[in-house]
A protein has these predicted regions:
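Extracytoplasmic
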Residues: 6-8, 15, 38, 81-83, ...
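A short, compositionally biased
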Residues: 3-12, 144
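Exported/periplasmic cell-wall-interacting domains
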Residues: 53-152
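Short, solvent-exposed loop/turn elements at domain surfaces
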Residues: 12, 28-29, 51-54
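Short, surface-exposed loop motifs enriched in S/T, G, D/E and P with embedded aromatic residues
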Residues: 15-23, 41-45
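Short, surface-exposed secondary-structure junctions/capping segments
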Residues: 28-47
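Solvent-exposed coil/turn segments that connect beta secondary-structure elements
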Residues: 7-9, 23-25, 46-48, 89-91, ...
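N-terminal post-signal-peptidase region of extra-cytosolic proteins
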Residues: 1, 21-33, 65-72
Length: 152
């Protein structure tokens, strides 16, 4: 099971612990809140196998771009989703599944981030950001439909 600890800004899986960055708006489930959802989830989809480190994704598809500081400057303000995506789906109807609280419909992912993104401090708009090498390691070890617990 993947365990994400929002206050500690960590993700743990099979004896490994990684620094992450969750929402700068804190925990929450409502659609449009830009918060990181809590509770039981699963990895509904794994996206990006075989893509290079820093591959850029838009709407879960690789753009063919590879993130660089120069590309970052050209697209200031872009929410960078890089390298790999683990798309989460809630398992608790009314809390993080269905209706106005559906994690999957909110497009909440565990994903790679630019090297300039600070880990260990909230900074995302809902997703769980990781270092690119860390998300590749996690992606390769996590099976589809793996359980995920997000605690606040």
């Amino acid at each position: 099971m993947i365990v994400i600890d929002i206050p500690a800004q960590t993700l743990a899986f099979e004896g490994r612990s990684y620094l992450v960055s969750t929402s700068k708006k804190g925990p929450g489930e409502k659609n449009g809140s830009l918060c990181t959802p809590r509770g039981r989830h699963i990895v509904r989809a794994k996206i990006g196998a075989g893509q290079p480190l820093n591959a850029v994704f838009v709407r879960r598809r690789p753009t063919g771009e590879v993130w660089t500081p120069e590309l970052h400057e050209e697209h200031a303000g872009r929410d960078w989703i890089l390298t790999r995506i683990l798309w989460l789906s809630g398992c608790e109807p009314g809390r993080n599944r269905l209706g106005e609280v559906d994690t999957m419909r909110r497009y909440i992912y565990i994903h790679g981030s630019p090297d300039t993104a600070e880990m260990g401090k909230p900074g995302s708009i809902g997703c769980i950001r990781m270092r690119n090498r860390d998300i590749v390691e996690l992606f390769d070890r996590v099976p589809p439909y793996a359980p995920v617990q997000i605690n606040a």
